[in-house]
Amino acid sequence: MADRLRSQAKLEQLQARYVGVGNAFTTKYEWMVNQHRDTLSSVVGHPPLLAYMATALGEPRVQVRKNLLEKMIMPCGPPPPSNQF
C-alpha cells in the first residue's frame, strides 16, 4: 500500500515538474508533440549532437539549428480534427 502511494506521489511530482510526462487526459497527439519537441530541443541544446547532425546532413550547424527550431512549431503536422461540437 505504501509503495503504491509513494509511486502515485512521485508521478504527480513529475507531472507538475515536466510538461511532457502528461496525465490521464493527454491525447496521443499531445504526447507525440511533447516527445518530438523534447528530442529536438535536446539536439539544439547539446552542441556535439548538433554538430553530429550537421555533419550527417552536410549542412552548416546554424542552418540545422534553424531548421530544428522551425520544426518545433508543429513537429507532428497539424492536429487531428476534434470530435467536440
From Swiss-Prot:
One of its GO terms (biological process) is mRNA splicing, via spliceosome. GO terms for cellular component: cytosol; nucleus; precatalytic spliceosome; U2 snRNP. Disulfide bonds: none annotated. Pfam families: SF3b10. Belongs to the SF3B5 family. PANTHER family: SPLICING FACTOR 3B SUBUNIT 5. This is Uncharacterized protein C211.05.
